[in-house]
Amino acid sequence: MKDQIAMLASNRKENSVIPDMNILENMYLSEHTLSAWKPAISKKKEIERYKKYKEMLNIKANSCEDLITSLSGGNQQKVFLARWLNTDAEILLLDNPTQGIDVGAKAEIYKLILELAKQGKTILINTLEIPEIQKVADYCAVFYNGEIIKILEHQEIDEMTVMMYSTNAAQAEEGK
């Protein structure tokens, strides 16, 4: 965050949700963490920003004072995206950003990722969902045994090609 990098961790229930905190507190957790580097914002300003992100991300919540656990998984994920968008980071690391959420929420997150990329943000996505990669990626780095084996351009990304490189089948064929 300090160096303009933000990360949306996978498994939101273990890595992001603070169940005893409300939506607003969960959304601004990073803001309070950053207060050592910059002045904290007022509750009024937090609520204004909450309303902005609620509309922008289509977060379905009755009140910002409701517990985060009252939201669906997709809406929780949007709150955590707002948490990091609020930092205005230049680089976003998204680890399985649509894992365990409904199709509608996935589409909204894809739209947001594309919009952020248009704004010049660098977005690195870790996912096993190849259709997700096809929708939002300019490039796809395929790993095998912890090393990048191949970098595919957007038009090269398809399930067969990604699977071939990720299982090292392409290198086995080239070695024959």
Q: What do these predicted ranges mean?
A:
Residues 1-176:
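Glycine-rich phosphate-binding loops of nucleotide-dependent enzymes
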